[in-house]
Amino acid sequence: MNYAKLCEDLTKWIKEEVESANLKGAVFGISGGIDSAVLACLCKKAFGDNALGLIMPIKSNPKDEEDARILAKSIGLRFTKVDLNESYDALIGTFEKNSVEMAASNIKPRLRMITLYYYAQNNGYMVLSGSNRSEFMTGYFTKYGDSGADLMPLLNLYKTDIFEMAKVLGVPDVIINKKPSAGLWEGQTDEDEFGFTYEELDDYLMNNSNTKSKDLIDKKIKQSEHKRKFAKSFEFDRRNY
């Protein structure tokens, strides 16, 4: 693929979509990871100073914030840090003590989504998500969290595409070379949770290749099907009532 042309076309598309909504820029999270880094680069090209990145730590690895700052400095991105630790602690404190770890972890991206929309409305911006196709198809996202956005520019691009785009866009090596992680807890990595690599996953999704992880991938796709659909509603014919 010609990733340089893809980045140009995607930048143009983002700008057109935001302007068609009569908005002037974009706000998005910068986590120190590669997806948000690629999104930040595209938005910076599209909007200049009207691209705003938010660093939103919640029990996060300090190295991730450091990497997010390195990215912002390298591309001249305007950014703000919003520390959500106290908000998270206050919310968790109102719940039962023996909560499921994942239920508590999923609060983090939902708090970030709320924060992004606050800044979007205050600035006349659109909320953009860095979710990619690999994560979307396996359900590796939080409903109404990192999937809560107005625009998902990377949703039809696989994780392996994101890595190639990062090289074209000049994302710092410290981000390109780190293991992808949702940062849900210390030491957590995407591929450890999956049980397979992004290369395996993307090859299977794109080419239906024969991989030893086929059954596991199919299971994740099936189990997460509900996450890719709008909430169902009761359908009825008024003439029957």
From Swiss-Prot:
Q: Which UniProt key words apply to this protein?
A: ATP-binding, Ligase, Magnesium, Metal-binding, NAD, Nucleotide-binding
Gene3D superfamilies in the cross-refs? HUPs (3.40.50.620)
Name the positions where Mg(2+) binds: 35, 135
* Superkingdom as given in the UniProt entry: Bacteria
Q: Which GO terms describe its biological process?
A: NAD biosynthetic process
- Spell out where the chain crosses the membrane: none
Please give the catalytic activity noted in the UniProt record: deamido-NAD(+) + NH4(+) + ATP = AMP + diphosphate + NAD(+) + H(+)
Gene Ontology terms, MF aspect: ATP binding; glutaminase activity; metal ion binding; NAD+ synthase (glutamine-hydrolyzing) activity; NAD+ synthase activity
Q: Where does deamido-NAD(+) bind?
A: 110, 143, 150, 226-227
Q: Which InterPro entries match?
A: NAD/GMP_synthase (IPR022310), NAD_synthase (IPR003694), NH(3)-dep_NAD(+)_synth (IPR022926), Rossmann-like_a/b/a_fold (IPR014729)
Q: Is the NAD keyword given for this protein?
A: yes
Q: Identify the GO cellular component terms for this protein.
A: cytoplasm
UniProt keyword annotation of NAD present = yes
EC code(s) of this entry: 6.3.1.5
Q: State what this protein does.
A: Catalyzes the ATP-dependent amidation of deamido-NAD to form NAD. Uses ammonia as a nitrogen source.
Q: Can you tell me which family this protein belongs to?
A: Belongs to the NAD synthetase family.
Spell out the subunit comment.
Homodimer.
The protein's name: NH(3)-dependent NAD(+) synthetase
Originating species: Finegoldia magna (strain ATCC 29328 / DSM 20472 / WAL 2508)
